[in-house]
Amino acid sequence: MQKQRLLNVGFGNFVVAERVVSIVNPASAPMRRLREEARDQGRLVDATQGRKTRSIIVTDSNHVILSAIQAETIGQRFIQEENS
């Protein structure tokens, strides 16, 4: 059985690292539209714990995950997870 690696997206929330397609900054208009479309279609997972959204994670199942951790920080965690 293959061991699944988990990516910490902040505040005790984890995502299966192999399912992550992209980690992006939420500031642009296309990312805001992506978030709204995901919310309307029931594909949005809010992992911010009530804090400001600082990154958006898109998975291979087309789910959109909001995180209060900077995209750069999650990216570094992703790289560390791949190397371990």
Curated annotation (Swiss-Prot):
Which Pfam family, giving just one, matches this sequence? RemA-like
Query: What's the family?
Result: Belongs to the RemA family.
Q: What is this protein called?
A: Putative regulatory protein Dde_2720
- Protein source organism: Oleidesulfovibrio alaskensis (strain ATCC BAA-1058 / DSM 17464 / G20)
